[in-house]
UniProtKB/Swiss-Prot annotation:
Its EC number is 6.1.1.20. This is Phenylalanine--tRNA ligase alpha subunit. Tetramer of two alpha and two beta subunits. Keywords: Aminoacyl-tRNA synthetase, ATP-binding, Cytoplasm, Ligase, Magnesium, Metal-binding, Nucleotide-binding, Protein biosynthesis. Its main location: cytoplasm. The keyword Protein biosynthesis applies. Its cofactor is Mg(2+). One of its GO terms (cellular component) is cytoplasm. NCBIfam families: pheS. It catalyses: tRNA(Phe) + L-phenylalanine + ATP = L-phenylalanyl-tRNA(Phe) + AMP + diphosphate + H(+).
Length: 346
């Protein structure tokens, strides 16, 4: 067959094959390129026939070979773009999103139940004219114990198993150190001190359903002239009604705390049975919610406050206990495990 005719047929047949290739023929395109333009391809084989041509015809056919090579090389490059574009389009179509479909419902986050409880309690006290004061979680032994009428040899220190960092530095066991620091700075000539100190505290307890090595407290303090036990009871009565319902009553039972004298445990009438007796109040009609008392004169004197002129009351409650009572939670560990099945309930 005439070499020029073979070149023309190779060009035409290759162009026709290229037109048939789409995005699914990436490998076939590469194979055809090697078959036609490769070192052992069809065009190379035809090129070998140049040696058999006459001197006059060889340049003419050689030029035609180069033209065919250029045409086919360009054709392969263009078809490669077409194949790749078709491949991308097919992928886009397979992964396309139907914009008419309803969107997925977004799950919104919300405040943790302990945060909700803390903010609600803080709002109650802010409405009563108290200030909210924060403090250090890593505290000095002096402020945590000695300023609370607990010297180093006091037996009541055994009531609070403590995380010590050094002999004088510890993780606070209550937020009372905030009260001591605030009393040091308060100017009583401008009026009484009314404050609460919410925050996280730490004790060396074994974690179980009712105990945790860390928990949250809100402690309150009022110091001024002529502050009495009646003021304490009235304040606690109002707090209990706002937290547990307007019909709640409270009772005070004698107790002991080193930093208050006298000291009391405070119970609230059961909000589930109304005081008749149920499983929540253990058939007593009352639920213990906090400890309180009149500030010990020694605590006032250590802040440079004249205990003959000024008196005060203090109280402390656990946020976890309040939340557990209000929402019927029976395991304190649920607050800290990060299980959304628990937190989403609130």
């Amino acid at each position: 067959m005439d070499l020029q005719k073979q070149l023309e047929e190779l060009k035409i047949s290759t162009q026709e094959k290229l037109k048939e290739m789409t995005g699914n023929h990436t490998k076939e395109l590469q194979d055809l390129r090697v078959q036609v333009l490769g070192k052992k391809g069809s065009l190379t084989e035809l090129l070998k026939g140049l040696k058999d041509l006459s001197n006059d015809l060889r340049p003419v056919v050689g030029k035609q070979v180069n033209e065919v090579r250029d045409i086919l090389t360009k054709a392969f490059e263009e078809q490669a773009k077409v194949v790749e574009a078709a491949k991308i389009q097919a992928q886009l179509e397979s992964e396309s999103v139907d914009v008419t479909l309803p969107g997925r419902q977004m799950t919104l986050g919300h405040r943790h139940v302990l945060t909700q409880t803390s903010e609600e309690i803080e709002d109650i006290f802010l409405g009563m004219g108290f200030q909210v004061v924060g403090g250090f979680e890593v505290e000095k032994d002096y402020y945590n114990f000695e300023r609370m009428n607990l010297p180093k040899d006091h037996p009541a220190r055994d009531m609070q198993d403590t995380f010590y960092i050094t002999e004088e530095i510890l993780l606070r066991t209550h937020t009372s150190p905030v009260q001591a620091r605030t009393m040091d700075q308060h100017d009583f000539s401008k009026g009484p001190l009314k404050m609460i100190s919410p925050g996280r505290v730490f004790r060396r307890d074994t974690d179980d359903a009712t105990h945790s090595h860390q928990f949250h407290q809100i402690e309150g303090l009022v110091v001024g002239e002529n502050i009495s036990m009646g003021d304490l009871k009235g304040t606690l009565q109002l707090i209990s009604q706002k937290m547990f319902g307007a019909e709640r009553k409270i009772r005070l039972r004698p107790s002991y705390f080193p930093f208050t004298e006298p000291s009391v445990e405070v119970d609230v009438s059961c909000f589930k049975c109304g005081g008749k007796g149920c499983n929540v109040c253990k058939q007593t009609g009352w639920i213990e919610i906090l400890g309180a008392g009149m500030v010990h004169p020694s605590v006032l004197e250590m802040s440079g406050i004249d205990s003959e002129k000024y008196s005060g009351f203090a109280f402390g409650l656990g946020q976890e206990r309040i939340a557990m009572l209000r929402y019927g939670i029976n395991d304190i560990r649920g607050f800290y495990q990060g299980d959304v099945r628990f937190t989403d309930q609130f």
